[in-house]
């Protein structure tokens, strides 16, 4: 009898639906293509997609599960007319380019709806003003610091 009850409990546990949220948990550089669907722990109720600018033409994408959402949550798609998305595209001087918080399975899989983050900069990259002298002096100091400190000149 105890065996039968244990068997029913084990089989019944498989029928219980999990309320855990599934989010993509990954990080990538210059691409939104990373995907790693993972079940979030019970206390983490939101999926997050954050894009941060590191350099002018280099950005970092992070997809995570999170406990809190500091921005308004994006609603799941439905058959009703869709509401305006609550995604944020942030311009200078902030390092965050795009931020999305949502609460349905795998909702943080895609990046912004347009390629606004990848605006081409006017002019050629080689035509921009560079400070080669500062780079040269910094490199010179790094290369000669050991020798100068040995001579007690630095």
From Swiss-Prot:
Transmembrane segments: none annotated. Strongly expressed in testes and weakly expressed in the epididymis, ovary, and uterus. Expressed in testicular germ cells (TGCs). Expressed in the testicular seminiferous tubules, in spermatocytes, spermatids, and testicular spermatozoa. Residues 1-20 form the signal peptide. Keywords: Cell membrane, Cytoplasm, Cytoplasmic vesicle, Glycoprotein, GPI-anchor, Lipoprotein, Membrane, Secreted, Signal. A lipid is attached at residue 123 (GPI-anchor amidated glycine). CDD domains: TFP_LU_ECD_Ly6K (cd23550). Disruption phenotype: Knockout Ly6k mice are viable and show no overt developmental abnormalities. Males are infertile. GO terms for biological process: binding of sperm to zona pellucida; flagellated sperm motility. It is a lipid-anchor; GPI-anchor. One of its GO terms (cellular component) is plasma membrane. SMART domains: LU (SM00134). The keyword Cell inner membrane does not apply. Residues 124-154 form a propeptide. It is found in: Secreted; Cytoplasm; Cell membrane; Cytoplasmic vesicle, Secretory vesicle, Acrosome. Residues 21-117 form the UPAR/Ly6 domain. It holds the Pfam family UPAR_LY6. InterPro entries: LY6_UPA_recep-like, Snake_toxin-like_sf, Sperm-ZP_regulatory. Required for sperm migration into the oviduct and male fertility by controlling binding of sperm to zona pellucida. May play a role in cell growth. Interacts with ADAM3 and TEX101. This is Lymphocyte antigen 6K. It comes from Mus musculus.
């Amino acid at each position: 009898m105890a065996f039968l009850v244990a068997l029913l409990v084990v089989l019944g546990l498989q029928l219980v639906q999990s309320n855990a949220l599934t989010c993509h948990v990954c990080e990538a550089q210059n691409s939104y293509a990373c995907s790693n669907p993972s079940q979030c722990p019970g206390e983490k109720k939101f999926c997050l997609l954050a894009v941060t600018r590191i350099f002018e033409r280099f950005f970092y994408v992070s997809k995570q599960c999170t406990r809190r959402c500091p921005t308004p949550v994006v609603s799941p798609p439905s058959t009703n007319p869709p509401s305006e998305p609550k995604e944020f595209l942030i311009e200078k001087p902030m390092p965050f380019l795009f931020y999305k918080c949502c609460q349905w399975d795998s909702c943080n899989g895609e990046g912004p709806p347009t390629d606004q983050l990848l605006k081409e900069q006017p002019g050629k990259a080689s035509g921009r003003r560079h400070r080669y002298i500062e780079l040269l002096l910094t490199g010179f100091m790094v290369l000669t610091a050991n020798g100068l400190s040995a001579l007690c000149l630095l």
